[in-house]
Design a protein with these regions (language model features):
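Metal-dependent phosphoester/phosphodiester hydrolase catalytic core
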Residues: 1-402
């Protein structure tokens, strides 16, 4: 059931429920409208990689308990099409099969909502969502029914055309503090047969034009740009993550970074998902002749990126059979090869929290266990980017915002 409601006041909490023809009522839901210009603060939860089979959704439970978050941004892999036997922590019955049509995807969405923490999070605050490769079948006609089911089961702005339901990139404006620009780097890629070709595009020409026009027209203090995949360059021990990220589209990244740098478009924070690890990175301008990047001063960075750890999907430790020795070696290698990284965590799961004011954004990284139900969480790190700086402050502060 989806209902579009007009005439709501900005920056206001509303409660809602649904009643069917037989008088049966749904659980009570709570939402919050976006603020009007002049709001002094916005807080966003950021998540991705929520596999019901790989662990418990304790992170969702902790988000649901918060009353200080304006919206949740889910950057894809909201659900998973298959059960990974190497991560089989729990499999609610009945045993699922891989969806291959719209009915199968509808069933998978219903299956996920058997989880009480997910239901609580969905009922406690508004969600801004985009799909990724496990939410649909990108190579099948009509995306295997995945796009249709995703739209039916989630609150997404209606498509610009009934003939293009796959178009879900959009802007959500939070007063005059930030423009949330949700991109889709999955379904509009323009591939090339030549690796590294300048003709390849991760956004596609139409979406790139939309994104750059939104950035140019924005008069908000910040732009928070959602990307399902990692934006930052990755070298060394984590380079294998780059196969489906912006690393595979270097010309696209250079084009966008050049647009930001040459146009004087400061104060952009990219949020990303998919890779399951936690990563905070400066974004060096890769173009020849650009200001050389300095990890000490942040010079040469055109913005910053935050990728919180997955809600539950397997991390580096799961992929190396829990070997802490290997995890430590990969961690050291990643940090040594990537001076732009301000924070790395390869094993923990949870969510990110962005605390946005006109002068700075503080990113908090919250972690919860996944192997059993738990009502605990811990603050694993905080980072700060100052207005006009375009790089993460170092050393990072280590106190939660209040």
């Amino acid at each position: 059931v989806q209902v579009r409601v007009d005439g709501l006041a900005p920056g206001t909490i509303y409660y809602y429920r649904f009643t069917n023809a037989d008088g049966e009522r749904s659980e009570l839901g709570r939402t919050r409208t976006t603020p009007e210009p002049g709001a002094e603060r916005v807080r966003l939860a950021v998540v991705s990689g929520s596999s019901i089979y790989s662990g418990y959704f304790n992170a969702y439970g902790r988000i649901a308990e918060r009353t200080d978050v304006d919206a949740l941004v889910h950057l894809g892999d909201y659900l998973y099409d298959f059960v990974d036997d190497e991560e089989r922590v729990r499999v609610p019955m009945p045993e699922p099969v891989v969806p291959d049509d719209v009915a199968g995807w509808r069933g998978r969405h219903a299956y996920y909502l058997t989880d009480p923490n997910l239901r609580a999070a969905r009922a406690s605050l508004p969600w801004v969502m985009i799909w990724d490769n496990h939410d649909l079948e990108q190579r099948e006609a009509d995306f295997g029914g995945g796009v249709q089911a995703f739209r039916e089961w989630n609150a997404i702005t209606p498509p610009v055309s009934v003939d293009a339901p796959e178009i879900a990139y959009r802007r959500v404006r939070f007063g005059s503090l930030l423009d949330l620009l949700i991109t889709d780097v999955l379904l509009f890629r323009e591939e090339s047969l030549v690796p590294g070709s300048d003709e390849a595009s991760i956004l596609g020409a139409t979406q790139y034009a939309w994104l750059t026009s939104q950035i140019s027209a924005s008069d908000s203090a910040w732009r928070v740009i959602g990307s399902q995949k990692i934006v930052a360059p990755i070298e060394g021990s984590l380079a294998l993550l780059g196969g489906s990220t912006w690393d595979a589209f270097e010309a696209s990244r250079a084009q966008l970074f050049g647009f930001l740098a040459d146009g004087g478009h400061d104060d952009n924070l990219f949020i990303s998902g998919d890779a399951h690890i936690t990563l905070a990175s400066d974004l060096p301008d890769p173009r020849p002749g650009a200001t050389p990047y300095s990890a000490t001063t942040g010079a040469g960075s055109i913005g910053v990126e935050l990728m919180p750890g997955s809600v539950s999907r397997g991390n580096v430790d799961e992929s190396v059979n829990g070997s802490q020795t290997l995890v430590n070696a990969i961690d050291r290698g990643a940090r040594a090869a990537n001076p732009q990284f301000a924070f790395v965590d390869l094993v923990r799961h949870g969510y990110g929290l962005l605390d946005v004011t006109a002068e700075r954004i503080v990113a908090e990284l919250w972690y919860s266990p996944i192997l059993e139900p738990s009502d605990t969480e811990e603050l694993g790190g905080t980072l700060e980017v100052q207005r006009g700086a375009n790089h993460w402050q170092r050393p990072a502060p280590m106190e939660p915002t209040e």
